[in-house]
């Protein structure tokens, strides 16, 4: 009986406690254009493309698009979707988002919202996001993601 109980507990711990981690690193060039209004609020479209690699050895190209907003009180928003296509033509789409609290630091959050079959285990993975921009709109970014 004790052996059965230990076997069941071991199975439950492995099944429910198993989480993985993957790290993505990317570089690219961003293009941000839009409007700044008289009250200093703004609405801008964000587009970028570049290259990525993962801690599992995959690599490929990415394209991103979304919005960068600021209201008249200085509250900022960043909501961008990036499609990452691998060397094997598999893909995953990551939503990257930030609010005012993290706007200046380049830190934020991300979540994987869609994926092809080979990346389907990553759907729902939550990630920390960090990006550094150079003066020329080139950037370096990293996401550290946890998944089950």
PLM segments and residue spans:
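Beta-strand-enriched cores of mature, soluble protein domains
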Residues: 18-148
């Amino acid at each position: 009986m004790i052996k059965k109980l230990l076997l069941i507990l071991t199975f439950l711990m492995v099944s429910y406690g198993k989480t993985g981690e993957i790290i993505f690193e990317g570089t690219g060039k961003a293009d941000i254009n839009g409007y700044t209004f008289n009250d200093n609020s703004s609405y801008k479209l964000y587009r970028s493309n570049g290259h990525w690699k993962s801690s599992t050895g995959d690599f490929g190209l990415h394209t991103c698009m979304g919005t960068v907003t600021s209201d008249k009180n200085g509250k900022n928003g960043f909501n961008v979707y990036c499609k990452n296509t691998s060397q094997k033509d598999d893909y995953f789409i990551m939503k990257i988002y930030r609010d005012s609290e993290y706007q200046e630091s380049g830190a934020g959050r991300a979540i994987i919202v869609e994926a092809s079959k080979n990346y389907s285990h990553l759907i729902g993975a939550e990630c920390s996001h960090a990006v550094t921009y150079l003066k020329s709109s080139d950037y370096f970014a990293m996401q550290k993601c946890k998944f089950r």
